[in-house]
Regions:
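Acidic/glycine-enriched connector segments
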Residues: 221-387
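SIR2/sirtuin-family catalytic core signature
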Residues: 27-36, 56-59, 67-76, 89, ...
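Glycine-rich anion-binding loop/nest that anchors nucleotide
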Residues: 44, 98-162, 242-246, 307-324, ...
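Gly/serine-rich nucleotide phosphate-binding loop at the start of the catalytic core
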Residues: 1-34, 38-41, 46-57, 116, ...
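Short, flexible loop segments at the rims of nucleotide/cofactor-binding pockets, characterized by
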Residues: 15-22, 99-107, 220, 286-292, ...
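Glycine-rich phosphate- or other oxyanion-binding loops that anchor nucleotides, phosphorylated ligands
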Residues: 79-111, 290-299
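A phosphate-binding glycine/aspartate-rich beta-alpha loop in the early core of alpha/beta enzymes
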Residues: 1-15, 67-73, 261, 265
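Short, hydrophobic/glycine-enriched beta-strand segments
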Residues: 210-219
Length: 390
């Protein structure tokens, strides 16, 4: 009888999630895809996360046996669907009924062990759950069992209960979670917009990339007083990490002066720079060859996903591709107006979202860009410092 009941529920779930009417990824999925994370655990059955990460290399774990193969997941995002997926070859394995939840640790030993390992070694951010949610109870059980072994600090963001008594219970639940290393933030949602949740997620997405900055532009530039000064001033920003993916040109000039200034300051260069091997370093023609498209896409994604701030100078095909990837991943873009500005910079200046985003960080840079005046190093540094200070 239980099997028959599960079969009916299963058919309804599959029918619901396999129709295309009204089920689309939303702004929250988009922000998740912008985060610099390696693993996402979800109890949802749908494929909206996969859709949101379609521009990203992913490894999907739909069931226990998916965790068996040792797969090279370097630079990929792992999505673990601990309760199964509607697109699984064996949808009957979806965790649906009360019995499924109660027997989960026995029927999914590999997933359970992986969950234990991640809870011990990674910090989790729980989103979309409430204290009454059965989906979260099994995970809380694991954390309680592991807390004596010193788990990492975990975080939970939940919507405030509207009922007074429910809110009291919610606060007690949140207080209890502190004993197990889980810090809970309860946000107001009176207008049902979940605006604060989105703001929290956007802030996390930005900060997940670290205090990182990437300078992109033409490979043909050989010298520039502006870039040399920029490299020196960037090196003087404490805890800033400079990302480099060019062997010559704009980024390399900045890198050289950045390293020189770090050495002058007696700082370890190893802790201040991250260098990514560029497959086009010795043959720039590869940028335009279709057969190398997947390789270049992977390279640019790995580089930009680590970048919080991108400074853009005039460039060509490669620079444009990096800008497009930065837009997808929510990177803060700072266009630079120089005497040799080209249409690539003009396109950025015409992008209201990019320019307006800089207004709160540096009014002087914002007004210079709006008035199409030459950018100064001082304006750029002010903007970068204020972004990192948020």
């Amino acid at each position: 009888n239980n099997l028959n009941n599960k079969g009916r529920i299963l058919n309804k779930i599959v029918e619901c999630y396999t129709t295309t009417d009204g089920i689309y990824s939303n702004k929250y999925h988009k922000v998740l895809a912008q985060m610099n994370v390696t693993t996402i655990w979800t109890t949802n059955y749908d494929t909206l996360l996969e859709e949101s990460f379609r521009h990203v290399s992913t490894v999907i774990r739909r069931c226990d046996t998916d965790l068996l193969p040792i797969v090279d997941i370097d630079q990929k995002v792992e999505i673990i669907k601990m309760h199964g997926s509607v697109d699984s070859p064996s949808p009957e394995n979806l965790v649906i009924t009360k019995e499924d939840y109660e027997d989960y640790f026995y029927t999914h030993p590999l997933t359970t062990e992986r969950l234990k390992n991640d809870l011990l070694n990674k910090s989790f951010l729980f989103i979309g759950y409430s204290y009454r949610d059965s989906n979260i109870r099994s995970i809380m059980t694991q954390i309680r069992q592991l807390c004596s072994r010193g788990t990492r600090t975990h975080y939970m963001v939940v919507e405030k209960e509207k009922n007074v008594n429910s809110y009291k219970l919610q606060k007690l639940w949140a207080k209890d979670l502190e004993r197990f290393g889980i810090k809970t933030y309860i946000y107001e949602n009176a207008d049902q917009s979940h605006r604060e949740l989105l703001e929290i997620m956007e802030s996390i997405a930005q900060k997940s990339k670290g205090n990182t900055l990437f300078v992109t532009g033409s490979h043909t530039v050989e010298e520039s007083a502006f870039l040399e000064e920029l490299g020196v001033e960037l090196a003087r920003i404490k805890n800033l990490t400079l990302i480099n993916g060019q062997s010559k040109g704009v980024a390399n000039i900045v890198l050289k002066s950045f390293i020189d200034e770090c050495l002058n300051l007696g700082q370890s260069v190893q802790n201040r720079i991250e260098i990514y091997a560029n497959p086009c370093a010795h043959n720039e023609d590869w940028e335009t060859k279709e057969e190398y498209g997947a390789l270049l896409e992977s390279f640019k994604y790995r580089l930009v996903r680590q970048t919080q701030i991108m400074i853009v100078l005039p460039g060509s095909y490669g620079t444009k591709a990096e800008i497009e990837k930065a837009k997808q991943l929510g990177t803060i873009i700072i266009p630079i107006i120089t005497e040799d500005r080209n249409e690539l910079i003009d396109e950025l200046l015409e992008n209201i979202n990019i320019v307006e985003r800089l207004k709160i960080f540096s009014p002087s840079l914002y007004h210079s860009l709006k008035n199409e005046q030459l950018t100064t190093v001082a304006e750029v540094i002010e903007c970068v410092k204020n972004i990192l200070a948020v």
